[in-house]
Amino acid sequence: MNETITYDTWNDMLSKQITDQLIDELDVLKWAYRTYGEKIVYACSFGAEGMVLLDLISKINKNAHIIFLDTGLHFQETYELIETVKERYPGFAIQMLEPELSLTEQGTKYGGELWKHNPNLCCQLRKIEPLKKHLSGMTAWISGLRRDQSPTRKHIQYVNLDQKFELIKICPLIHWTWDDVWTYIRLHNLPYNKLHDQHYPSIGCEMCTLPSPDPNDERAGRWAGREKTECGLHQE
C-alpha cells in the first residue's frame, strides 16, 4: 500500500481505499509513519488513550516526534507523568509547546482568569495557536480520538481531512472502547495519570477539569457547568 494522501491531494475515494486496507491500530501506525516519515507528529495529552498510543508507537518508531500542549495550567500529576514517560521511552523526542503569551501577559491583555470568563479564547491562545504554528511544517498528525468518547466524535475515521489545520489527521484508536484502553494499560503495566483513579476520565487544564459526575460520559468533567465540551482542536 503505497498511496500517499495529503490535504492538497485529498479525495474521498482514495481515503476510503486506504482505510479499507488498514486492519487495526498497528497497521494504521505502520502505514502512517511509512507514508509521512518526519512529516508526522503525535499530539499527546498524556491521558489514558495517550499512554496506549505511546506504547503502540514505540513498537513502530522508537524515535517518534511527540508534542504536548503545555498551557501552564495542567495538573502536577500530568507533568510528573510526562517525566515518567521520558524515562520509559528514552528515544521519543517529546517537545513541550508553550503559548506565545505567559499567563501574566495573557492576564494583562485579556483580564485575569480568562478560562472563567472566556474559555474559548483561553483555549485558542494556549492550545490551538501553538499547535497550529507547529503543525504548519507537518503533513499529518496523530490523535487518540475514539468514536465512543462523545457524540461529536462518532464519525471519525482512521484517516481524516483536518480542515482546521489543513493536513491529514490519523486516528488509530477509533474502534477502541474505554474498557479496551484500560485493559491494554493493565495488561502492559503502563504508567498513567493517577487522577484517573480519582474519577477523572478526561484530564485537561486544572482550572477546567473536575471529576466526572457521569460514569457513562467520559468528558462530563471538562468545562463543567458550561456548554463548552471541546477545546477546539478537533472542531472544524
From Swiss-Prot:
* Pathway where it operates: Sulfur metabolism; hydrogen sulfide biosynthesis; sulfite from sulfate
**Any one Gene Ontology molecular-function term assigned to this protein's record:** phosphoadenylyl-sulfate reductase (thioredoxin) activity
Report which reactions are catalysed by this protein.
[thioredoxin]-disulfide + sulfite + AMP + 2 H(+) = adenosine 5'-phosphosulfate + [thioredoxin]-dithiol
Q: Which residues hold [4Fe-4S] cluster?
A: 122-123, 205, 208
GO biological process per UniProt: cysteine biosynthetic process; hydrogen sulfide biosynthetic process; sulfate assimilation, phosphoadenylyl sulfate reduction by phosphoadenylyl-sulfate reductase (thioredoxin)
| Disulphide bond pairs | none
Keywords for this protein: Cytoplasm, Iron, Iron-sulfur, Metal-binding, Oxidoreductase
Keyword Iron listed? The answer is yes
Active site per UniProt? 231 (nucleophile)
Q: Which cofactor does it need?
A: [4Fe-4S] cluster
CDD domains in the record: PAPS_reductase
**One Gene Ontology cellular component annotation held by this UniProt entry:** cytoplasm
Q: Would the keyword Signal be found if you checked this record's keyword annotation? A: no
Task: Sum up the protein's function in the record's words.
Answer: Catalyzes the formation of sulfite from adenosine 5'-phosphosulfate (APS) using thioredoxin as an electron donor.
Family in the record: Belongs to the PAPS reductase family. CysH subfamily.
Q: Which NCBIfam families match?
A: APS_reductase, cysH, PRK02090.1
> What's the protein called, per UniProt?
Adenosine 5'-phosphosulfate reductase 2
Q: Species name for this entry?
A: Bacillus subtilis (strain 168)
Protein encoded by which gene: cysH1
